[in-house]
Regions:
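Acidic/histidine-rich alpha-helical segments that form the ligand environment
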Residues: 97-130, 136-148
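Short, solvent-exposed, charged loop/turn and helix-capping segments
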Residues: 49-52, 92-93, 118-120
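Short, contiguous alpha-helical
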Residues: 32-36, 40-43, 51-91, 130-173
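Extreme N-terminal tail/first-helix region
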Residues: 23-33
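Well-ordered alpha-helical scaffold segments within catalytic/enzyme domains
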Residues: 41, 45-46, 80, 112-117
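Residues within well-ordered alpha-helical secondary structure of globular protein domains
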Residues: 13, 48, 71-74, 108, ...
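Bacterial Sec-dependent N-terminal signal peptides
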Residues: 1-25
Length: 173
């Protein structure tokens, strides 16, 4: 009986120790929540925008509707590659900005961003990286990723409204 008690105690300690190491940092959970929010809104808006409007641009030299969606998707890959120290060609798909391509790229890029970020530990978040000629902690750079996504969500809302498309979540209110 005494041996069973010891085995149970050691097992319990190992279980709780393992669980505490496996817990996701609060910052990562909050980041993933923001990614889900922006993904949901951008995907709804991209779905609501008619295919014919994907080539619309508010002016010469400004990204079209479809190009904004593809840019947001590619930026997810690019900014994550900066964190990981990998190379990514930022302009590999921007010429293909039709609705089907844009939706597919966004879906995949958001899933990739979430899967990668979900693995980050507190130690990873504290690492220093260099991007855009500046030094960032990974945590701070993840804030930059979210800010960038929100920037293009706002841009996409403006584009939609300029084309007579009401964001689906606004239409429901």
């Amino acid at each position: 009986m005494h041996i069973l008690k010891k085995i149970f105690s050691v097992g319990a300690v190992l279980l709780f120790t393992t669980m505490s190491f496996a817990e996701q940092p609060v910052f990562v959970k909050e980041f993933l929540g923001q990614v889900d929010f922006v993904k949901g809104r951008l995907m709804q808006l991209a779905e609501a925008m008619p295919e014919d409007n994907y080539s619309w641009t508010p002016g010469e030299g400004v990204r079209s509707v479809g190009e904004v969606y593809v840019h947001a998707a590619e930026a997810n890959y690019y900014m994550l590659s900066l964190i990981k120290g990998e190379k990514f060609d930022m302009n590999s798909a921007e010429s293909k900005s039709d609705k089907k391509t844009a939706l597919s790229l966004m879906e995949k890029s958001f899933d990739n961003l979430k899967e990668s970020a979900a693995q980050f530990t507190d130690e990873d978040l504290d690492k220093e990286i260099e991007a855009f000629g500046m030094k960032f902690s990974v945590r701070n750079f993840m804030v930059t990723i979210i800010a960038h996504l929100h920037e293009h969500l706002g841009q996409s809302i403006a584009y939609a409204r300029m084309n007579g498309v009401t964001p689906p979540w606004s239409a429901q209110e």
